[in-house]
Swiss-Prot record:
GO molecular function ontology, one term from the record: dGTPase activity
Organism domain of life: Bacteria
Domain HD: 69-217
Protein name in the entry: Deoxyguanosinetriphosphate triphosphohydrolase-like protein
InterPro entries from the UniProt entry: dGTPase, dGTPase-like, dNTPase_2, HD/PDEase_dom, HD_domain, PHydrolase_assoc_dom
Organism: Rhodopseudomonas palustris (strain BisB5)
NCBIfam families with a match to the protein in the record: dGTP_triPase, PRK01286.1-1, PRK01286.1-3
PROSITE patterns: HD
Alphabetic keyword roster: Hydrolase
Length: 404
């Protein structure tokens, strides 16, 4: 099937006309499906706009062409829609989940998340998926009737469960949450609006999750090449990318390094999309789910790479870990970024009146209990852009690292 050709809506995909609804009842739109409305609400949210100035790997002022959380999310959405189109899934729901998946990330990428997690270790830590849920259900203030965006059940369950179930049917955390438990924010929300934490998410959510992996692999290669952290030929260390590079050399023997890198990224994305689509079709053929509910109640995920492609994808991640994420240049900046977030957290804890007026409790900081104060500080810092975090640090401290 052509990548650009949409398959008929499949029985195993989510149908907006059969949505489980929203936490707060709203009349339907005359010209948009429930999932299209969700997508539009995400795009128009303040949190989505802030992704423009949140780090993917390189801090915001290192160059105009490196990815940010915003450009990454747009690229994930494009890949996810391409896969969803071939599988006959709801493209609007898939796009919504792709665009929303990073809304809970704090400034400075994973460095900021590590710092916030360490600061909150005695209080449950920090989880960006739980923070995304807070953004979507509480922290956006755009509507007179409710806090949050009041998105459909299908969108919220996809945000929370795109990587798989969180608990067993008895509510016990699965192994990945065994040490620290399922984030309390997710548990408490699910008690109010049951997200069935024990089941798999929809195919649309599973597609958005694997599209995130594809985008990370391909586009971090692109950014790493642009930054000079490695060259195209260094990627011959990975058999999959080596075979793509060899094919490019045969077809375009005189191609310059920049175009070789761009062609490598393009062909890698195409290869991974084709592989995951074929494997998912195979799994769907074997399981023959007749509805989205049967997908949720399956014994394993249905969207996946074939075994050999999964191994190749792991090799790409290992290459990037060594040559990019752990590169001295990147690590030095990320250590400073962690320190900035930790400094801000401690400062607001010690001097809560330093928070902006609209982030102070109405009764004043003195009247607030510690747990509420920590939640407020967490939400404030998690919503910062890289640029704003630096500006706040410069306002509150005598010396601020130069993240260059």
């Amino acid at each position: 099937m052509s990548v650009g050709m949409a398959a008929p809506r499949a029985a195993y995909g989510c149908d907006p006309d059969r949505s489980r609804g929203r936490q707060f009842a709203e009349p339907p739109s005359n010209n948009r499906s429930a999932f299209r409305r969700d997508c539009d609400r995400v795009i128009h949210s303040n949190a989505f706009r802030r992704l423009k100035h949140k780090t993917q790997v390189f801090v915001f002022h290192e160059g105009d062409h490196y990815r940010t959380r915003l450009t990454h999310s747009l690229e994930v959405a494009q890949i996810a829609r391409a896969i969803a189109r071939q599988l006959g899934l709801d493209e609007d729901l898939t796009e919504t989940l792709a665009l929303a998946h990073d809304l809970g990330h704090p400034p400075f990428g994973h460095a900021g998340e590590r710092a916030l997690d360490a600061c909150l270790r005695a209080h449950g830590g920090f989880d960006h998926n739980a923070q995304t849920l807070r953004v979507l259900t509480a922290l956006e203030h755009r509507y007179p009737e409710f806090d949050g965006l009041n998105l459909t059940w299908e969108t919220l369950e996809g945000v929370v469960k795109h990587n798989g179930p969180l608990t067993d049917r008895a509510g016990r955390p699965l192994p990945r949450y065994a040490e620290r438990g399922v984030p309390i924010g997710i548990v408490e929300f699910s008690q109010r609006f049951d997200l069935e934490l024990w089941s798999f998410a929809s195919l649309e959510a599973q597609v958005a999750a694997i599209a995130d992996d594809i985008a990370y692999d391909a586009h971090d290669i692109d950014d790493g090449l642009r930054a000079g952290l490695f060259r195209v030929d260094d990627l011959r260390a990975v058999p999959l990318t080596a075979s793509i590079i060899d094919g490019i050399a045969r077809r375009y023997p005189a191609l310059d390094e920049s175009r070789r890198g761009a062609e490598l990224v393009r062909e890698l994305i195409s290869h991974l999309i084709g592989a995951v689509t074929a494997e998912t079709m195979r799994r769907l053929g074997e399981a023959a789910p007749r509805s989205a509910e049967e997908v949720r109640h399956a014994s394993s995920a249905m969207v996946a790479f074939p075994i050999e492609t999964a191994a190749a994808e792991a090799e790409i991640k290992a290459f990037l870990w060594t040559h990019m994420y752990r590169a001295n240049r990147v690590m030095a900046v990320m250590r400073d970024a962690e320190a900035i977030v930790a400094d801000l957290f401690q400062r607001y804890c010690d001097h809560p009146a330093d928070l902006p007026p609209d982030w102070l409790p109405t009764d004043g900081p003195v009247a607030e209990c510690e747990a509420d104060r920590l939640r407020r500080i967490r939400n404030f810092i998690a919503g910062m852009t890289d640029r704003y975090a630096l500006t706040e640090h410069q306002r509150l401290f005598d010396s601020t690292p130069d993240l260059r």
